[in-house]
Amino acid sequence: MSGATLLKESGPKEVFCGLTSIVWLHRRMPDAFFLVVGSRTCAHLIQSAAGVMIFAEPRFGTAILEERDLAGLADAHDELNRVVKNLLARRPEIKTLFLVGSCPSEVIKIDLSRVAENLNIELKGQVTVLNYSGSGIETTFTQGEDGALKALIPLMPKSDQKKLLLVGTLANAVEDRLVSIFNRLGIDNVESFPPRQSTELPSIGPETKVLLTQPYLTDTARELKNKGAEIIEAPFPLGVTGSTLWIQAAANSFGIDKSIVDSILNPLISRAKKALEPHVEKLSGKKLFLLPESQLEIPLARFLSNECGMEIVEIGTPYLNRDLMKAEIDLLPPDCRIVEGQHVEKQLDRVRDSSPDLVVCGMGLANPLEAEGISTKWSIEMVFSPIHGIDQASDLAELFSRPLRRHDILNPTKTLTSN
Protein backbone atom coordinates (compact mmCIF):
# COMPACT_ATOMS: atom_id res chain seq x y z
CA MET A 1 0.00 0.00 0.00
CA SER A 2 1.00 3.67 -0.32
CA GLY A 3 2.27 5.72 2.59
CA ALA A 4 -1.24 6.91 3.45
CA THR A 5 -1.94 7.13 7.17
CA LEU A 6 -4.85 4.88 8.22
CA LEU A 7 -6.68 5.86 11.42
CA LYS A 8 -9.85 4.72 13.18
CA GLU A 9 -12.33 6.91 15.00
CA SER A 10 -15.58 6.21 16.85
CA GLY A 11 -18.26 8.39 18.37
CA PRO A 12 -21.39 10.30 17.27
CA LYS A 13 -22.11 10.01 13.53
CA GLU A 14 -23.87 12.23 11.02
CA VAL A 15 -24.84 10.02 8.07
CA PHE A 16 -27.90 8.78 6.20
CA CYS A 17 -29.11 5.26 6.95
CA GLY A 18 -29.24 2.43 4.41
CA LEU A 19 -32.89 3.11 3.56
CA THR A 20 -31.72 5.89 1.25
CA SER A 21 -30.43 3.40 -1.33
CA ILE A 22 -34.04 2.49 -2.13
CA VAL A 23 -34.18 5.76 -4.07
CA TRP A 24 -31.87 4.47 -6.84
CA LEU A 25 -32.66 0.75 -6.50
CA HIS A 26 -36.38 1.20 -7.21
CA ARG A 27 -35.51 3.07 -10.40
CA ARG A 28 -33.08 0.36 -11.45
CA MET A 29 -35.57 -2.52 -11.07
CA PRO A 30 -39.05 -1.22 -11.98
CA ASP A 31 -40.69 -4.63 -11.44
CA ALA A 32 -39.60 -4.68 -7.78
CA PHE A 33 -41.18 -3.04 -4.74
CA PHE A 34 -39.40 -1.96 -1.56
CA LEU A 35 -41.55 -2.08 1.57
CA VAL A 36 -39.88 -0.44 4.55
CA VAL A 37 -41.05 -1.77 7.90
CA GLY A 38 -40.54 1.33 9.99
CA SER A 39 -41.79 4.59 11.42
CA ARG A 40 -43.27 7.75 9.95
CA THR A 41 -39.78 9.22 10.07
CA CYS A 42 -38.60 6.43 7.72
CA ALA A 43 -41.49 7.20 5.37
CA HIS A 44 -40.69 10.93 5.34
CA LEU A 45 -37.00 10.22 4.65
CA ILE A 46 -37.64 8.05 1.59
CA GLN A 47 -40.43 10.26 0.24
CA SER A 48 -38.30 13.39 0.58
CA ALA A 49 -35.14 11.82 -0.85
CA ALA A 50 -36.99 10.43 -3.85
CA GLY A 51 -38.90 13.62 -4.56
CA VAL A 52 -41.95 11.62 -5.65
CA MET A 53 -45.14 13.54 -6.42
CA ILE A 54 -48.11 12.82 -4.20
CA PHE A 55 -50.13 11.53 -7.15
CA ALA A 56 -47.45 9.14 -8.38
CA GLU A 57 -47.45 5.36 -7.90
CA PRO A 58 -43.96 4.86 -6.47
CA ARG A 59 -42.34 1.45 -6.22
CA PHE A 60 -41.62 1.81 -2.54
CA GLY A 61 -43.68 2.35 0.60
CA THR A 62 -43.63 2.08 4.36
CA ALA A 63 -45.53 -0.32 6.60
CA ILE A 64 -45.71 2.08 9.53
CA LEU A 65 -45.21 0.65 13.00
CA GLU A 66 -47.80 2.19 15.30
CA GLU A 67 -47.74 2.45 19.09
CA ARG A 68 -49.64 -0.83 19.40
CA ASP A 69 -46.89 -2.61 17.46
CA LEU A 70 -44.12 -1.01 19.47
CA ALA A 71 -45.85 -1.81 22.75
CA GLY A 72 -46.38 -5.44 21.75
CA LEU A 73 -50.18 -5.13 21.87
CA ALA A 74 -50.49 -6.39 18.29
CA ASP A 75 -48.66 -9.20 16.52
CA ALA A 76 -46.45 -7.22 14.16
CA HIS A 77 -45.83 -10.31 12.01
CA ASP A 78 -49.57 -10.80 11.41
CA GLU A 79 -50.02 -7.10 10.69
CA LEU A 80 -47.17 -7.17 8.18
CA ASN A 81 -48.68 -10.20 6.43
CA ARG A 82 -51.93 -8.30 6.07
CA VAL A 83 -50.20 -5.20 4.68
CA VAL A 84 -48.24 -7.27 2.14
CA LYS A 85 -51.35 -9.06 0.89
CA ASN A 86 -53.19 -5.76 0.47
CA LEU A 87 -50.22 -4.33 -1.41
CA LEU A 88 -49.96 -7.28 -3.81
CA ALA A 89 -53.71 -7.22 -4.44
CA ARG A 90 -53.45 -3.56 -5.41
CA ARG A 91 -50.17 -3.88 -7.35
CA PRO A 92 -50.25 -7.27 -9.15
CA GLU A 93 -47.37 -6.21 -11.44
CA ILE A 94 -44.87 -6.57 -8.58
CA LYS A 95 -42.49 -9.48 -9.25
CA THR A 96 -40.04 -9.07 -6.36
CA LEU A 97 -40.89 -7.65 -2.96
CA PHE A 98 -38.12 -6.48 -0.64
CA LEU A 99 -39.01 -6.22 3.04
CA VAL A 100 -36.58 -3.63 4.36
CA GLY A 101 -35.73 -3.49 8.04
CA SER A 102 -35.36 -0.15 9.85
CA CYS A 103 -34.27 1.05 13.28
CA PRO A 104 -37.76 0.52 14.84
CA SER A 105 -38.22 -2.96 13.35
CA GLU A 106 -34.73 -3.97 14.50
CA VAL A 107 -35.35 -2.66 18.02
CA ILE A 108 -38.58 -4.62 18.51
CA LYS A 109 -37.05 -7.69 16.84
CA ILE A 110 -39.42 -8.23 13.93
CA ASP A 111 -38.09 -11.31 12.13
CA LEU A 112 -38.38 -10.21 8.50
CA SER A 113 -36.60 -13.32 7.25
CA ARG A 114 -39.33 -15.47 8.80
CA VAL A 115 -42.05 -13.25 7.34
CA ALA A 116 -40.43 -13.49 3.89
CA GLU A 117 -40.10 -17.27 4.16
CA ASN A 118 -43.76 -17.71 5.14
CA LEU A 119 -44.96 -15.38 2.38
CA ASN A 120 -42.92 -17.24 -0.25
CA ILE A 121 -44.58 -20.50 0.81
CA GLU A 122 -48.03 -18.91 0.75
CA LEU A 123 -47.59 -17.03 -2.55
CA LYS A 124 -46.21 -20.13 -4.33
CA GLY A 125 -43.92 -18.30 -6.73
CA GLN A 126 -46.37 -15.57 -7.70
CA VAL A 127 -44.01 -13.02 -6.12
CA THR A 128 -40.51 -13.50 -4.70
CA VAL A 129 -40.22 -11.99 -1.22
CA LEU A 130 -36.77 -11.07 0.10
CA ASN A 131 -35.53 -9.11 3.09
CA TYR A 132 -32.53 -7.05 4.11
CA SER A 133 -31.70 -4.35 6.65
CA GLY A 134 -31.55 -0.63 5.93
CA SER A 135 -31.44 0.21 9.62
CA GLY A 136 -29.26 3.10 10.73
CA ILE A 137 -28.20 0.90 13.64
CA GLU A 138 -26.56 -1.54 11.21
CA THR A 139 -25.99 0.36 7.97
CA THR A 140 -25.03 3.71 6.51
CA PHE A 141 -26.32 5.23 3.29
CA THR A 142 -25.00 3.08 0.42
CA GLN A 143 -24.85 -0.17 2.41
CA GLY A 144 -28.54 -0.63 1.67
CA GLU A 145 -27.65 -1.58 -1.90
CA ASP A 146 -25.10 -4.07 -0.58
CA GLY A 147 -27.84 -5.71 1.51
CA ALA A 148 -30.34 -5.81 -1.36
CA LEU A 149 -27.86 -7.41 -3.78
CA LYS A 150 -26.73 -9.93 -1.18
CA ALA A 151 -30.39 -10.96 -0.76
CA LEU A 152 -30.69 -11.59 -4.52
CA ILE A 153 -27.55 -13.72 -4.90
CA PRO A 154 -29.11 -17.04 -3.70
CA LEU A 155 -31.61 -16.71 -6.58
CA MET A 156 -28.94 -16.39 -9.28
CA PRO A 157 -28.79 -19.47 -11.54
CA LYS A 158 -25.55 -21.40 -11.98
CA SER A 159 -23.57 -21.18 -15.19
CA ASP A 160 -20.26 -22.36 -16.64
CA GLN A 161 -20.24 -19.65 -19.31
CA LYS A 162 -17.26 -17.31 -19.40
CA LYS A 163 -18.59 -13.83 -18.75
CA LEU A 164 -17.89 -10.42 -17.29
CA LEU A 165 -20.31 -9.35 -14.56
CA LEU A 166 -20.52 -5.64 -13.72
CA VAL A 167 -21.71 -5.38 -10.11
CA GLY A 168 -23.27 -2.23 -8.69
CA THR A 169 -25.99 0.14 -9.86
CA LEU A 170 -25.05 2.46 -12.71
CA ALA A 171 -27.09 4.94 -14.72
CA ASN A 172 -28.47 3.06 -17.74
CA ALA A 173 -26.74 5.34 -20.26
CA VAL A 174 -23.38 4.94 -18.48
CA GLU A 175 -23.81 1.18 -18.31
CA ASP A 176 -24.63 0.98 -22.03
CA ARG A 177 -21.50 2.97 -22.86
CA LEU A 178 -19.26 0.76 -20.70
CA VAL A 179 -20.75 -2.45 -22.11
CA SER A 180 -20.16 -1.10 -25.62
CA ILE A 181 -16.47 -0.54 -24.79
CA PHE A 182 -16.10 -4.08 -23.47
CA ASN A 183 -17.83 -5.45 -26.57
CA ARG A 184 -15.41 -3.54 -28.80
CA LEU A 185 -12.53 -5.02 -26.81
CA GLY A 186 -13.84 -8.50 -27.63
CA ILE A 187 -15.67 -9.28 -24.38
CA ASP A 188 -19.07 -10.20 -25.79
CA ASN A 189 -20.74 -11.76 -22.76
CA VAL A 190 -21.24 -8.83 -20.36
CA GLU A 191 -24.04 -8.76 -17.80
CA SER A 192 -24.99 -6.45 -14.96
CA PHE A 193 -26.06 -6.96 -11.37
CA PRO A 194 -28.51 -5.67 -10.31
CA PRO A 195 -30.30 -6.26 -13.62
CA ARG A 196 -32.85 -3.86 -15.08
CA GLN A 197 -35.59 -6.35 -14.21
CA SER A 198 -35.43 -8.14 -10.87
CA THR A 199 -36.60 -11.39 -12.48
CA GLU A 200 -33.78 -11.41 -15.07
CA LEU A 201 -30.92 -12.24 -12.75
CA PRO A 202 -27.58 -13.05 -14.38
CA SER A 203 -26.17 -16.53 -13.95
CA ILE A 204 -22.94 -17.11 -12.05
CA GLY A 205 -20.22 -19.74 -11.76
CA PRO A 206 -16.48 -20.41 -11.77
CA GLU A 207 -16.07 -18.76 -15.20
CA THR A 208 -17.71 -15.52 -14.01
CA LYS A 209 -15.32 -12.58 -13.61
CA VAL A 210 -16.74 -9.85 -11.38
CA LEU A 211 -15.85 -6.20 -11.91
CA LEU A 212 -17.18 -3.98 -9.11
CA THR A 213 -18.50 -0.58 -10.17
CA GLN A 214 -19.08 0.66 -6.61
CA PRO A 215 -16.74 0.45 -3.59
CA TYR A 216 -19.40 -0.25 -0.95
CA LEU A 217 -20.39 -3.79 -1.99
CA THR A 218 -18.36 -5.72 0.58
CA ASP A 219 -20.96 -8.38 1.45
CA THR A 220 -22.03 -8.75 -2.18
CA ALA A 221 -18.44 -9.34 -3.31
CA ARG A 222 -17.92 -11.91 -0.56
CA GLU A 223 -21.09 -13.84 -1.49
CA LEU A 224 -20.26 -13.81 -5.21
CA LYS A 225 -16.80 -15.13 -4.40
CA ASN A 226 -18.39 -17.89 -2.30
CA LYS A 227 -20.43 -18.80 -5.39
CA GLY A 228 -17.19 -19.40 -7.28
CA ALA A 229 -16.86 -16.10 -9.12
CA GLU A 230 -13.50 -14.36 -9.49
CA ILE A 231 -13.28 -10.76 -8.24
CA ILE A 232 -11.09 -8.65 -10.53
CA GLU A 233 -8.86 -6.33 -8.49
CA ALA A 234 -8.93 -2.79 -9.84
CA PRO A 235 -9.48 0.83 -8.88
CA PHE A 236 -13.04 2.03 -9.35
CA PRO A 237 -14.20 3.70 -12.59
CA LEU A 238 -14.13 7.31 -11.39
CA GLY A 239 -12.09 9.74 -13.44
CA VAL A 240 -9.89 9.07 -16.45
CA THR A 241 -7.18 7.12 -14.62
CA GLY A 242 -9.49 5.02 -12.46
CA SER A 243 -11.78 4.15 -15.37
CA THR A 244 -8.84 3.30 -17.64
CA LEU A 245 -7.22 1.00 -15.07
CA TRP A 246 -10.63 -0.56 -14.36
CA ILE A 247 -11.21 -1.39 -18.03
CA GLN A 248 -7.60 -2.57 -18.47
CA ALA A 249 -7.97 -4.93 -15.49
CA ALA A 250 -10.97 -6.59 -17.15
CA ALA A 251 -9.13 -6.79 -20.48
CA ASN A 252 -6.11 -8.40 -18.80
CA SER A 253 -8.38 -10.92 -17.10
CA PHE A 254 -9.72 -11.95 -20.51
CA GLY A 255 -6.27 -12.04 -22.12
CA ILE A 256 -6.89 -9.14 -24.51
CA ASP A 257 -3.78 -7.65 -26.12
CA LYS A 258 -2.68 -4.26 -24.79
CA SER A 259 -2.47 -2.77 -28.29
CA ILE A 260 -6.19 -3.43 -28.82
CA VAL A 261 -7.04 -1.83 -25.48
CA ASP A 262 -4.90 1.23 -26.22
CA SER A 263 -6.40 1.70 -29.69
CA ILE A 264 -9.90 1.86 -28.24
CA LEU A 265 -9.21 3.80 -25.03
CA ASN A 266 -6.64 6.37 -26.17
CA PRO A 267 -9.12 8.52 -28.16
CA LEU A 268 -11.51 8.50 -25.19
CA ILE A 269 -8.70 9.44 -22.81
CA SER A 270 -7.55 12.37 -24.99
CA ARG A 271 -11.07 13.75 -25.29
CA ALA A 272 -11.74 13.35 -21.56
CA LYS A 273 -8.50 15.08 -20.52
CA LYS A 274 -9.32 18.06 -22.75
CA ALA A 275 -12.81 18.31 -21.24
CA LEU A 276 -11.25 18.24 -17.75
CA GLU A 277 -9.00 21.26 -18.32
CA PRO A 278 -11.37 24.09 -17.27
CA HIS A 279 -12.28 22.24 -14.09
CA VAL A 280 -8.65 21.45 -13.26
CA GLU A 281 -7.88 25.15 -13.60
CA LYS A 282 -10.47 25.89 -10.91
CA LEU A 283 -9.69 22.96 -8.59
CA SER A 284 -5.90 22.84 -8.72
CA GLY A 285 -4.26 23.84 -5.44
CA LYS A 286 -7.55 23.95 -3.52
CA LYS A 287 -7.81 22.16 -0.17
CA LEU A 288 -10.40 19.37 0.13
CA PHE A 289 -11.81 17.68 3.25
CA LEU A 290 -14.04 14.62 2.78
CA LEU A 291 -16.36 13.70 5.64
CA PRO A 292 -17.57 10.06 5.76
CA GLU A 293 -20.90 8.99 4.28
CA SER A 294 -20.98 7.11 0.95
CA GLN A 295 -17.76 5.00 0.93
CA LEU A 296 -16.96 6.75 -2.37
CA GLU A 297 -14.61 9.08 -0.51
CA ILE A 298 -11.31 7.29 -1.26
CA PRO A 299 -11.84 6.95 -5.05
CA LEU A 300 -13.05 10.57 -5.17
CA ALA A 301 -9.98 11.77 -3.28
CA ARG A 302 -7.71 9.82 -5.63
CA PHE A 303 -9.37 11.43 -8.67
CA LEU A 304 -9.44 14.96 -7.28
CA SER A 305 -5.84 14.79 -6.11
CA ASN A 306 -4.16 13.02 -9.02
CA GLU A 307 -6.19 14.38 -11.94
CA CYS A 308 -7.44 17.73 -10.64
CA GLY A 309 -4.54 18.83 -8.46
CA MET A 310 -6.49 19.28 -5.22
CA GLU A 311 -4.73 19.08 -1.85
CA ILE A 312 -6.36 16.41 0.32
CA VAL A 313 -6.62 17.41 3.99
CA GLU A 314 -8.43 14.29 5.23
CA ILE A 315 -10.42 11.40 3.76
CA GLY A 316 -13.20 10.20 6.03
CA THR A 317 -14.99 6.94 5.22
CA PRO A 318 -17.68 5.08 7.20
CA TYR A 319 -15.97 1.72 6.64
CA LEU A 320 -12.71 0.69 5.02
CA ASN A 321 -12.43 -2.66 3.25
CA ARG A 322 -8.68 -2.86 2.77
CA ASP A 323 -8.94 -5.65 0.19
CA LEU A 324 -11.41 -3.84 -2.09
CA MET A 325 -9.64 -0.51 -1.59
CA LYS A 326 -6.02 -1.65 -1.97
CA ALA A 327 -5.72 -0.54 -5.60
CA GLU A 328 -7.23 2.85 -4.70
CA ILE A 329 -5.05 3.45 -1.64
CA ASP A 330 -1.94 2.55 -3.64
CA LEU A 331 -2.73 5.47 -5.99
CA LEU A 332 -3.18 8.08 -3.24
CA PRO A 333 -0.48 10.66 -2.44
CA PRO A 334 1.79 9.33 0.32
CA ASP A 335 0.84 12.01 2.85
CA CYS A 336 -2.93 11.32 2.80
CA ARG A 337 -4.77 10.78 6.07
CA ILE A 338 -7.65 8.27 5.93
CA VAL A 339 -10.00 8.11 8.92
CA GLU A 340 -12.35 5.13 9.19
CA GLY A 341 -15.48 5.76 11.26
CA GLN A 342 -16.53 9.09 12.69
CA HIS A 343 -16.62 11.29 15.73
CA VAL A 344 -18.46 14.15 14.09
CA GLU A 345 -17.55 16.81 16.66
CA LYS A 346 -13.83 16.04 16.45
CA GLN A 347 -13.97 15.93 12.66
CA LEU A 348 -15.73 19.30 12.50
CA ASP A 349 -13.02 20.74 14.74
CA ARG A 350 -10.41 19.46 12.27
CA VAL A 351 -12.39 20.97 9.39
CA ARG A 352 -12.36 24.40 11.06
CA ASP A 353 -8.68 24.14 11.97
CA SER A 354 -7.63 23.24 8.42
CA SER A 355 -9.70 25.93 6.62
CA PRO A 356 -10.43 23.83 3.51
CA ASP A 357 -11.71 25.39 0.30
CA LEU A 358 -14.30 22.62 -0.08
CA VAL A 359 -15.88 20.02 2.21
CA VAL A 360 -17.69 16.94 0.87
CA CYS A 361 -20.29 16.01 3.47
CA GLY A 362 -23.85 14.89 4.17
CA MET A 363 -26.81 17.22 3.77
CA GLY A 364 -27.20 17.60 7.54
CA LEU A 365 -23.77 19.20 7.88
CA ALA A 366 -23.73 21.27 4.69
CA ASN A 367 -25.86 24.25 5.77
CA PRO A 368 -24.12 24.76 9.15
CA LEU A 369 -20.74 24.70 7.39
CA GLU A 370 -21.96 27.06 4.66
CA ALA A 371 -23.13 29.43 7.42
CA GLU A 372 -19.53 29.46 8.66
CA GLY A 373 -18.32 30.46 5.20
CA ILE A 374 -17.08 26.98 4.17
CA SER A 375 -18.09 25.77 0.70
CA THR A 376 -19.64 22.30 0.63
CA LYS A 377 -20.72 19.57 -1.77
CA TRP A 378 -23.39 17.03 -0.80
CA SER A 379 -21.97 13.52 -0.93
CA ILE A 380 -25.40 12.18 -1.91
CA GLU A 381 -25.01 13.85 -5.32
CA MET A 382 -22.18 11.46 -6.19
CA VAL A 383 -24.56 8.51 -5.92
CA PHE A 384 -27.38 10.06 -7.93
CA SER A 385 -25.20 11.50 -10.71
CA PRO A 386 -23.86 9.58 -13.75
CA ILE A 387 -20.16 9.92 -12.88
CA HIS A 388 -18.61 6.56 -13.84
CA GLY A 389 -16.39 6.04 -16.85
CA ILE A 390 -13.79 7.92 -18.88
CA ASP A 391 -16.40 10.03 -20.69
CA GLN A 392 -17.93 11.20 -17.41
CA ALA A 393 -14.71 12.51 -15.84
CA SER A 394 -15.44 16.15 -16.66
CA ASP A 395 -18.99 15.84 -15.29
CA LEU A 396 -17.53 14.42 -12.09
CA ALA A 397 -15.02 17.27 -11.80
CA GLU A 398 -17.76 19.82 -12.43
CA LEU A 399 -19.62 18.62 -9.34
CA PHE A 400 -16.68 19.98 -7.32
CA SER A 401 -15.74 23.05 -9.37
CA ARG A 402 -19.32 24.34 -9.35
CA PRO A 403 -19.54 25.14 -5.60
CA LEU A 404 -16.17 26.93 -5.81
CA ARG A 405 -17.40 29.06 -8.72
CA ARG A 406 -20.60 29.78 -6.79
CA HIS A 407 -18.54 30.85 -3.77
CA ASP A 408 -16.50 33.22 -5.93
CA ILE A 409 -19.65 34.81 -7.37
CA LEU A 410 -21.19 35.29 -3.92
CA ASN A 411 -17.94 36.58 -2.40
CA PRO A 412 -16.29 38.73 -5.09
CA THR A 413 -14.34 40.84 -2.56
CA LYS A 414 -12.73 37.78 -0.94
CA THR A 415 -11.89 36.35 -4.34
CA LEU A 416 -10.11 39.54 -5.45
CA THR A 417 -8.22 39.71 -2.17
CA SER A 418 -7.05 36.08 -2.39
CA ASN A 419 -5.97 36.59 -5.99
Swiss-Prot record:
Pathway(s) annotated for this protein in UniProt: Porphyrin-containing compound metabolism; chlorophyll biosynthesis (light-independent)
Oxidoreductase is among the record's keywords: yes
A GO biological-process term: photosynthesis, dark reaction
Annotated Gene3D superfamilies: Nitrogenase molybdenum iron protein domain
Oxidoreductase keyword on record: yes
Keywords: 4Fe-4S, ATP-binding, Chlorophyll biosynthesis, Iron, Iron-sulfur, Metal-binding, Nucleotide-binding, Oxidoreductase, Photosynthesis
GO molecular function annotation: 4 iron, 4 sulfur cluster binding; ATP binding; metal ion binding; oxidoreductase activity, acting on iron-sulfur proteins as donors; oxidoreductase activity, acting on the CH-CH group of donors, iron-sulfur protein as acceptor
Residues that, per the record, bind [4Fe-4S] cluster: C17, C42, C103
Catalytic activity: chlorophyllide a + oxidized 2[4Fe-4S]-[ferredoxin] + 2 ADP + 2 phosphate = protochlorophyllide a + reduced 2[4Fe-4S]-[ferredoxin] + 2 ATP + 2 H2O
Cofactor(s) the protein needs: [4Fe-4S] cluster
Signal peptide (UniProt feature, chain positions): none
Free-text comment on the cofactor: Binds 1 [4Fe-4S] cluster per heterodimer. The cluster is bound at the heterodimer interface by residues from both subunits.
Function: Component of the dark-operative protochlorophyllide reductase (DPOR) that uses Mg-ATP and reduced ferredoxin to reduce ring D of protochlorophyllide (Pchlide) to form chlorophyllide a (Chlide). This reaction is light-independent. The NB-protein (ChlN-ChlB) is the catalytic component of the complex.
Subunit structure: Protochlorophyllide reductase is composed of three subunits; ChlL, ChlN and ChlB. Forms a heterotetramer of two ChlB and two ChlN subunits.
Protein name per Swiss-Prot or TrEMBL: Light-independent protochlorophyllide reductase subunit N
